[in-house]
Amino acid sequence: MASRRRVLLKVIILGDSGVGKTSLMNQFVNRKFSNQYKATIGADFLTKEVQIDDRIFTLQIWDTAGQERFQSLGVAFYRGADCCVLVNDVNVMKSFENLNNWREEFLIQASPSDPENFPFVVLGNKTDVDGGKSRVVTEKKAKSWCASKGNIPYFETSAKDGVNVDAAFECIAKNALKNEPEEEVYLPDTIDVAGARQQRSTGCEC
């Protein structure tokens, strides 16, 4: 049986503990949201096939722990990333102020070949909380920071309601694709079949 080629796009999600990284990933991949908070231990990832310009790509999304004691694991998980997503909670100023620390840590540990042009996307999450009355990070402030870092794309999201989640990940996928080398990952059919079974088990709706 003939084999086919597929491009794997690796995306890393970073941000303080509790900003909604896991919820954003689950909302995008599985269309699910849980009010029960459970801290990520180390790192985890989900995959989803996305279509860009009539081509199918596999998006591998890594959800990393926000706790400091796990940050030393960064090198192993960050290497080979095609895009980095920085997430903050619009209701917690400290999570916004820490975005620069997360960005710098990623660039140091991932060591991308062209750090000046490496693609980042920023998500201001939890816009649904208290009807928006609790927010302390304004859209203007967030966009100003993004502009100062090379015009990083910015989206305001609600993992709970699904607001802007698809649009954000479409942008993430396109930016990851721009950074992906021309060479494609070669996957034999035997591995592809196993991957398809794994995908069905996650409940992914592509």
Curated annotation (Swiss-Prot):
Subcellular location: Cell membrane
GN (gene name): RABG3C
Covalent lipidation (S-geranylgeranyl cysteine), chain numbering: 204, 206
Protein name as it appears in the record: Ras-related protein RABG3c
A cellular component annotation (GO) from this entry: nucleus
SUPFAM superfamilies recorded: P-loop containing nucleoside triphosphate hydrolases
Motif (Effector region): 37-45
InterPro entries associated with the record: P-loop_NTPase (IPR027417), Small_GTP-bd (IPR005225), Small_GTPase (IPR001806)
Species whose genome carries this gene: Arabidopsis thaliana (Mouse-ear cress)
Main localization category: membrane
